Amino acid sequence: MEQRNFTVAENTKLAAGTYRMVLTGDTSAITRPGQFVDIRLEGRFLRRPISVCSWTADSLTLIYKTVGAGTEQMSAMAPGTVLDVLTGLGNGFDVTKAGARPLLVGGGAGAAPLYGLAQKLAEAGCR
């Protein structure tokens, strides 16, 4: 786990109540698909845990639903907003334990980390 500052690069409405947020910053603590981040929001006591959809060396993509005041606050964030983020949380998925043809099942916003898992499985030679 590492605490880092990330900058909102994009915050796009995908559908009613569903958003894609792209954050730029150091993602070196994210080592496996299925991990999550905790985002500190101004005026909120608790951080917001959000699954990582996908990541590169300098950005990460989050897909989230607005289900309360905290995620509503996130949906209004403009590009350039700087966020305090705990990264590299959770165990994630171990792609070395996957079979040759893994089956991924998920639904709603819970399917977001499966995108990153599918990418890593493809890189590992799974079909």
Model-derived regions: residue spans:
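FNR/FR-type flavoprotein reductase catalytic core
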Residues: 69-127
